[in-house]
Protein backbone atom coordinates (compact mmCIF):
# COMPACT_ATOMS: atom_id res chain seq x y z
CA UNK A 1 0.00 0.00 0.00
CA UNK A 2 1.35 3.45 -0.88
CA UNK A 3 1.77 6.38 1.48
CA UNK A 4 -1.29 8.63 1.74
CA UNK A 5 -1.23 11.84 -0.26
CA UNK A 6 -0.55 15.01 1.71
CA UNK A 7 -2.29 18.27 0.89
CA UNK A 8 -2.24 21.80 2.31
CA UNK A 9 -5.50 23.47 3.26
CA UNK A 10 -5.82 27.25 3.55
CA UNK A 11 -8.83 28.82 5.24
CA UNK A 12 -9.62 32.49 5.95
CA UNK A 13 -11.32 34.02 8.95
CA UNK A 14 -12.08 37.61 9.88
CA UNK A 15 -12.36 39.57 13.09
CA UNK A 16 -12.27 43.19 14.20
CA UNK A 17 -10.12 44.34 17.12
CA UNK A 18 -8.34 47.40 18.43
CA UNK A 19 -4.87 47.85 19.81
CA UNK A 20 -2.37 50.46 20.86
CA UNK A 21 1.27 49.95 19.98
CA UNK A 22 3.17 51.07 23.05
CA UNK A 23 6.19 49.54 24.76
CA UNK A 24 6.77 50.08 28.47
CA UNK A 25 10.48 49.64 27.68
CA UNK A 26 10.55 52.84 25.62
CA UNK A 27 10.05 56.51 26.45
CA UNK A 28 6.94 58.36 25.32
CA UNK A 29 9.01 60.05 22.60
CA UNK A 30 10.48 56.76 21.38
CA UNK A 31 7.04 55.15 21.30
CA UNK A 32 5.66 58.08 19.29
CA UNK A 33 8.62 57.97 16.88
CA UNK A 34 8.58 54.19 16.34
CA UNK A 35 4.83 53.53 16.29
CA UNK A 36 3.58 56.87 14.94
CA UNK A 37 -0.21 57.15 14.81
CA UNK A 38 -0.46 53.54 16.04
CA UNK A 39 0.70 54.87 19.44
CA UNK A 40 -2.54 56.86 19.86
CA UNK A 41 -3.40 56.64 23.60
CA UNK A 42 -6.96 55.68 22.69
CA UNK A 43 -5.89 52.90 20.34
CA UNK A 44 -7.14 52.21 16.84
CA UNK A 45 -8.91 49.34 15.12
CA UNK A 46 -8.44 46.92 12.27
CA UNK A 47 -10.55 44.45 10.37
CA UNK A 48 -8.11 41.54 10.37
CA UNK A 49 -8.12 38.70 7.86
CA UNK A 50 -6.40 35.60 9.21
CA UNK A 51 -5.39 32.79 6.89
CA UNK A 52 -4.40 29.50 8.47
CA UNK A 53 -2.61 26.75 6.55
CA UNK A 54 -2.79 23.13 7.65
CA UNK A 55 -1.36 20.03 6.02
CA UNK A 56 -2.24 16.40 6.34
CA UNK A 57 -2.96 13.10 4.68
CA UNK A 58 -6.12 12.75 2.65
CA UNK A 59 -8.54 10.48 4.46
CA UNK A 60 -9.54 7.73 1.99
CA UNK A 61 -13.12 7.67 3.33
CA UNK A 62 -13.84 11.42 3.19
CA UNK A 63 -11.37 12.59 0.56
CA UNK A 64 -10.40 15.46 2.91
CA UNK A 65 -7.54 16.15 5.31
CA UNK A 66 -10.02 17.37 7.92
CA UNK A 67 -13.63 18.40 8.31
CA UNK A 68 -14.04 22.11 7.61
CA UNK A 69 -16.77 22.19 10.26
CA UNK A 70 -14.31 20.84 12.85
CA UNK A 71 -11.64 23.33 11.78
CA UNK A 72 -14.09 26.25 11.83
CA UNK A 73 -15.29 25.29 15.30
CA UNK A 74 -11.71 25.04 16.59
CA UNK A 75 -10.67 28.41 15.10
CA UNK A 76 -13.85 30.14 16.27
CA UNK A 77 -13.37 28.89 19.82
CA UNK A 78 -9.64 29.64 20.09
CA UNK A 79 -9.29 32.78 17.97
CA UNK A 80 -12.48 34.53 16.89
CA UNK A 81 -14.22 34.40 20.28
CA UNK A 82 -10.99 35.49 22.00
CA UNK A 83 -10.14 38.44 19.75
CA UNK A 84 -13.26 39.69 17.93
CA UNK A 85 -14.31 43.17 19.07
CA UNK A 86 -11.66 43.22 21.79
CA UNK A 87 -9.00 45.69 22.82
CA UNK A 88 -5.98 43.42 22.48
CA UNK A 89 -3.77 44.99 25.15
CA UNK A 90 -6.65 45.33 27.63
CA UNK A 91 -8.59 42.09 27.12
CA UNK A 92 -6.15 39.45 25.87
CA UNK A 93 -3.78 38.18 28.60
CA UNK A 94 -0.91 37.52 26.16
CA UNK A 95 -0.77 41.25 25.36
CA UNK A 96 -0.73 42.60 28.89
CA UNK A 97 3.08 42.48 28.69
CA UNK A 98 3.84 42.03 24.97
CA UNK A 99 3.24 44.83 22.49
CA UNK A 100 0.14 43.82 20.44
CA UNK A 101 1.83 44.15 17.05
CA UNK A 102 0.47 42.04 14.24
CA UNK A 103 3.75 40.13 14.30
CA UNK A 104 3.04 39.11 17.90
CA UNK A 105 -0.60 38.44 17.03
CA UNK A 106 0.58 35.93 14.39
CA UNK A 107 2.63 34.09 16.99
CA UNK A 108 -0.20 34.10 19.54
CA UNK A 109 -2.71 32.72 17.03
CA UNK A 110 -0.22 30.07 15.89
CA UNK A 111 0.26 28.96 19.51
CA UNK A 112 -3.51 28.77 20.02
CA UNK A 113 -4.07 26.67 16.88
CA UNK A 114 -1.09 24.32 16.78
CA UNK A 115 -2.88 21.72 18.91
CA UNK A 116 -5.54 21.07 16.25
CA UNK A 117 -5.68 17.26 16.34
CA UNK A 118 -6.62 16.41 12.74
CA UNK A 119 -3.94 18.22 10.70
CA UNK A 120 -0.58 19.95 11.12
CA UNK A 121 -0.54 23.74 11.36
CA UNK A 122 1.95 25.08 8.82
CA UNK A 123 1.50 28.86 9.07
CA UNK A 124 -0.67 31.76 10.16
CA UNK A 125 -0.88 34.82 7.92
CA UNK A 126 -2.65 38.01 8.99
CA UNK A 127 -3.68 40.88 6.75
CA UNK A 128 -3.85 43.96 8.94
CA UNK A 129 -4.50 46.44 6.12
CA UNK A 130 -4.52 46.29 2.35
CA UNK A 131 -0.79 47.14 2.51
CA UNK A 132 0.40 45.17 5.57
CA UNK A 133 0.45 41.43 6.07
CA UNK A 134 2.48 39.21 8.39
CA UNK A 135 3.13 35.48 8.44
CA UNK A 136 4.48 33.11 11.09
CA UNK A 137 5.35 29.51 10.32
CA UNK A 138 6.38 28.37 13.78
CA UNK A 139 10.02 27.93 12.86
CA UNK A 140 11.28 29.61 16.02
CA UNK A 141 9.35 28.26 18.95
CA UNK A 142 8.99 30.34 22.06
CA UNK A 143 6.73 32.76 23.80
CA UNK A 144 5.95 36.29 22.76
CA UNK A 145 8.73 38.78 23.52
Language model features: what each stretch is:
Residues 1-145:
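Charge-rich, low-complexity N-terminal segments
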Amino acid sequence: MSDPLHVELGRRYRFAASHRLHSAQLSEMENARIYGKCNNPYGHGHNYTVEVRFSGAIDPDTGMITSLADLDSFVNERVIEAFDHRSLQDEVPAFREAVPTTENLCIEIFQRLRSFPRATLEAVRIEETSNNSFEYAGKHEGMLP
